[in-house]
Amino acid sequence: MNPPVVWPSRGGLNLITWVLLLVTLPALTAAPPAASAESQLDRKANEQELGAAIYDNLKAQRVIVESSPLYEVLTPISSAIVRAAQPRYYLPMKVWLVHSAQPNAFATPGGNIFVTDELLYFAKNREELAGTLCHEVSHLIHEDSMELAEKQERLLRRELGATILLGPSAANVLAITLIGKLQSLRYSRDVESRADLTGADVCTSAGYNPWGLVWLFGAFENSQSTERPEFLSDHPDNQSRIAALKQHFASDPGRFGRYSSELSSASPISVPQKAPEVFLR
């Protein structure tokens, strides 16, 4: 999924978000990360720092849900997926529920995956929800969110010039520029497709039918809603992504052959509408 750029104004999240937090972290450098062990340790520390800043920012907005009946649906699924994916990622993974009017999920540097309450209302079965989460943990596995953050930070530094990066106004200048670039922050088609395929593998490792992501594509295509998760939007080639998933399934019948492609085989979920939520403070 792409990092969130603009959230609906009718309630919940207003994430000019983790991208803006880049300006508070001077440890991110203008040069690409080197291959030395020391530089890799520095990069991991930078990622942890950025992840913590994102979390603190969302917590300050009071949109992270501490307790809700929705967790009774989310936690069993997310726990199984985290157990399956964690060996492939070097920082602890954690799944959080956040309040928003848009069905969405997104992974951020540092290992956090945020799932909006509206996605639980939209998803019709466990497999669709699992497919979304598996797609997101795949962005962590491939370090996509951190690489995108570093790339954007480097581009800004080149564009703004070294002179303005000195003094107390540097962060403000970077922030203003980032606001103007939020709409362009997108994962590439290849990155999204890779997350689809890795996500399918994670789903099977967690015990979930990997066809759930295909069904979710179809659900949004058939929906009257104009709101959809970022990783399903702005990609006119969704059909090619579905085709790539089907080809992936066919390439390994030992892994995927036991799962039904029929939506009728899915496990429905039922969540209480307008479920009460207590927010972290």
For each predicted feature, which ranges?
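N-terminal targeting signals for Sec/Tat export/insertion, comprising classic cleavable signal peptides
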Residues: 44-72
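Conserved beta-strand segments that form the floor/walls of ligand-binding pockets within enzyme
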Residues: 114
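Short pre-active-site segment immediately N-terminal to the catalytic Zn-binding motif
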Residues: 117-131
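Catalytic Zn2+-binding segment of zinc metalloproteases
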Residues: 127, 137-153
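Post-HEXXH active-site segment of zinc metalloproteases
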Residues: 146-176, 214
